[in-house]
Amino acid sequence: MRVVYSVEEVEIPKGVSVSIERTGPFDYIVKVKGPLGEVTKEFKNTPVVMSLQDGKIVMEVFKARKREYAILGTYKGILKNMFLGVTRGWRYKLKVIYTHFPMLVKVQGNQLVIENFLGRKSKITLNIPKGVKVEVKGKEDIVIEGIDRELVSTFAAAVQAATELHGDERPSPHGREGGLGVVDGIYVVGYEHIKS
């Protein structure tokens, strides 16, 4: 069933400025500025019409079906994350877990380097995206911070995925004699805001 018209409004927090630029018939660029910096997102081929009205971002959709409602909800979540990013920031925490071969994780320039994963001689290197700050605390903790949640969470997931075993490398989930198997890796253990 189609609904002729639906609208969602997102309140702009105090201390945050927003600009919406229409770049094509169905394309928008939204810029959000706050005390911690600026986040820019591009919305392409969208059925949603965006505008600024009375301190709110108004999103309208015409002849909406389930897909359009889903997009409306997704955009609302993205905008709220942008507001939280420029006012409070995002911090993801990762834990380095190893049982036999001690893994060494360090930041070199704009790369995160993982050495001695499962005793391998080859290094795993990941390029740190612009706008993301990575800090290695001790031997077991990694902290990833930034104002763009999409960038920060995607990089945290990439770090975890870099130490996952795939295909023939992956041992039995029960390991030898019914043990845990290989638990070595880097895992996302939580996230929080930089400012409370």
Swiss-Prot record:
Matching InterPro entries: Ribosomal_uL6-like (IPR000702), Ribosomal_uL6-like_a/b-dom_sf (IPR036789), Ribosomal_uL6_a/b-dom (IPR020040), Ribosomal_uL6_arc (IPR019907)
Entry's Gene Ontology BP terms: cytoplasmic translation
Keyword Chloroplast in annotation: no
Keyword Transmembrane helix attached: no
A GO CC term attached to the entry: cytosolic large ribosomal subunit
Pfam families per record: Ribosomal_L6
Record key words, sorted: Ribonucleoprotein, Ribosomal protein, RNA-binding, rRNA-binding
Gene Ontology MF annotations: rRNA binding; structural constituent of ribosome
Function: This protein binds to the 23S rRNA, and is important in its secondary structure. It is located near the subunit interface in the base of the L7/L12 stalk, and near the tRNA binding site of the peptidyltransferase center.
Family the UniProt entry places it in: Belongs to the universal ribosomal protein uL6 family.
Binding partners and assembly: Part of the 50S ribosomal subunit.
Designated name of the protein: Large ribosomal subunit protein uL6
Annotated organism of origin: Pyrobaculum aerophilum (strain ATCC 51768 / DSM 7523 / JCM 9630 / CIP 104966 / NBRC 100827 / IM2)
Lineage: Archaea, Thermoproteota, Thermoprotei, Thermoproteales, Thermoproteaceae
